[in-house]
């Protein structure tokens, strides 16, 4: 996530968080932390903003983690994901990294979150300066997540200073985001655009991007068109993790939007998932046999040669 937030914003957020924390018992170190925005504040099931005001419509509480949280927890043997889950966290957005530059703790974070029973999504920070690179970024992401049960969205973090420094126009940036999200969606995953208020209003044409929004705005304001996740602070405290943690609230039930098992359709293509993982190769469902390509798409209404033998598939994908 973008680290160079303005000094003014950080100062205001810090003040707000101090006010909120004045009304709770200070955390007693690593194992008993209570974050400033609702993980235990005000009692079980309470969701509050930086000023302690209730936040309505929250479906799930989550966190964002990367190598930074992993390293901050190293003295305690790494992130204690079981403790994280017990604190009320139900999903984690895991940092994948940059193009051809995987976060060094991506695998550990994914495995730890999944082993504890958390839902997982990923976020990827773009450095693309053209649509071809944005497309390549999407392909890189897909190559890294194909073997994991992704039950939350795949996020494109567009807050890139490199993009602005190179003078890309709003339309050029929008085109890049569109290409990335289309590629992710075509592969059967649910894309989401991560950005703050300035980027959404000044650097992207949101009328061309009909995707979920992961809204990064610290403090109290959490509403934006298509906002499904709100990132409300990067100074939360969560049991099981050392140091600051970025806290998220989800306002939709992704369990109903992203199927865990069975067939799912993306435009004209069909995929089959088991525990959120896209299946490939031969598949038997009931008394019918199907074949799913390397990209997970069901082969249908054609004849293909597989291992030297021709196979014909009906319009519904069933083997003749």
Q: What is each of the regions a protein language model found here?
A:
Residues 32-82, 208-260:
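Functionally critical loop-and-helix segments that line ligand-binding/catalytic clefts
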Residues 35-181, 185-187:
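Substrate-binding cleft of extracellular glycoside hydrolase catalytic domains
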Residues 120, 190-192, 213:
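Hydrophobic anchor at the start of a short beta-strand
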Residues 142-156, 160-162, 204-226:
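Structural recognition of alpha->loop->beta junctions
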């Amino acid at each position: 996530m973008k680290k160079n937030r303005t000094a003014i914003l950080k100062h205001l957020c810090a003040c707000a968080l101090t006010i909120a924390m004045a009304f709770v018992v200070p955390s007693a170190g690593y194992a008993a932390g209570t974050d400033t925005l609702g993980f235990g504040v005000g009692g079980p099931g309470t969701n509050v903003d930086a000023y302690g005001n209730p936040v309505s419509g929250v479906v799930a509480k989550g966190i964002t983690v990367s190598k930074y949280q992993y390293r901050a927890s190293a003295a305690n043997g790494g992130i204690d994901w079981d403790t994280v889950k017990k604190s009320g966290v139900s999903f984690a957005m895991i940092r994948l990294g940059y193009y051809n530059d995987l976060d060094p703790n991506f695998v550990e974070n994914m495995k730890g979150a999944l082993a504890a029973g958390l839902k997982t999504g990923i976020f990827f920070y773009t450095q693309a300066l053209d649509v071809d690179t944005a497309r390549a970024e999407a392909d890189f992401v897909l190559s890294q997540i194909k073997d994991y049960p992704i039950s939350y969205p795949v996020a494109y973090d567009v807050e890139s200073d490199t993009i602005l420094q190179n003078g890309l126009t709003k339309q050029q940036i929008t085109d890049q985001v569109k290409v990335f999200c289309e590629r992710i969606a075509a592969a059967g995953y649910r894309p989401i655009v991560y950005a703050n208020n300035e980027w959404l209003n000044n650097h992207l044409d949101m009328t061309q991007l009909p995707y979920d929004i992961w809204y990064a705005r610290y403090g109290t304001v959490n509403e934006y068109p298509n906002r499904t996740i709100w990132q409300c602070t990067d100074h939360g405290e969560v049991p099981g993790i050392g140091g600051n943690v970025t806290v998220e609230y989800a306002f939709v039930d992704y369990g109903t939007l992203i199927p865990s098992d069975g067939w799912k359709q993306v435009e004209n293509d069909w995929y089959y998932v088991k525990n959120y993982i896209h299946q490939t190769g031969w598949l038997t469902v009931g008394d019918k046999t199907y074949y799913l390509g390397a990209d997970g798409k069901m082969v249908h209404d054609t004849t293909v040669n597989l291992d030297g033998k021709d196979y014909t598939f009906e319009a519904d994908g069933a083997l003749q």
